[in-house]
Amino acid sequence: MRIKVGLKCEECGDINYSTYKNSKNTTEKLELKKYCPRLKKHTLHKEVKLKS
């Protein structure tokens, strides 16, 4: 089952990206280095639940 999750910047706290993840195959939370437009650099983004 795919669920919609957000990716929140660890440095500024903004949710910059949303994506889907398969909760059966990926049980741990996502951690990706993505571009933060507010800080204008690549930072660590962690998974958060989105209100649906």
UniProtKB/Swiss-Prot annotation:
Any one Gene Ontology cellular component term annotated for this protein: cytoplasm
Instruction: Show the Pfam families listed in the entry.
Output: Ribosomal_L33 (PF00471)
Q: Which UniProt keywords apply?
A: Ribonucleoprotein, Ribosomal protein
Q: Does the record carry Ribonucleoprotein as a key word?
A: yes
Q: InterPro entries from the entry?
A: Ribosomal_bL33, Ribosomal_bL33_CS, Ribosomal_bL33_sf, Ribosomal_zn-bd
Matching PROSITE patterns: RIBOSOMAL_L33
Q: Which family does it belong to?
A: Belongs to the bacterial ribosomal protein bL33 family.
Its protein name is Large ribosomal subunit protein bL33
The species is Campylobacter jejuni subsp. jejuni serotype O:2 (strain ATCC 700819 / NCTC 11168)
